[in-house]
Amino acid sequence: GILSSFKGVAKGVAKDLAGKLLETLKCKITGC
């Protein structure tokens, strides 16, 4: 239903944000 598809979208967005955050952190630590 709508709820499960919303959960899927939220999971995708969270994964995307986490990936960007990790990359930014890596850049700050190791220097891009």
Swiss-Prot record:
GO terms for cellular component: extracellular region; membrane; other organism cell membrane. It holds the Pfam family Antimicrobial_2. It comes from the Eukaryota. The keyword Transit peptide does not apply. It is found in: Secreted; Target cell membrane. Keywords: Amphibian defense peptide, Antibiotic, Antimicrobial, Disulfide bond, Immunity, Innate immunity, Membrane, Secreted, Target cell membrane, Target membrane. Expressed by the skin glands. Disulfide bonds join C27-C32. Its main location: secreted. GO terms for biological process: defense response to bacterium; innate immune response. InterPro entries: Antimicrobial_frog_2. The structure is characterized by a full length helix-turn-helix conformation between residues Ile-2-Leu-21, Leu-22-Leu-25 and Lys-26-Thr-30, respectively. Antibacterial peptide with amphipathic alpha-helical structure. Active against E.coli ATCC 25726 (MIC=4-5 uM) and S.aureus ATCC 25923 (MIC=8-10 uM). Has a weak hemolytic activity on human erythrocytes (LC(50)=150-160 uM). Belongs to the frog skin active peptide (FSAP) family. Ranatuerin subfamily. This is Ranatuerin-2CSa. It comes from Rana cascadae (Cascades frog). The lineage of its organism: Eukaryota, Metazoa, Chordata, Craniata, Vertebrata.
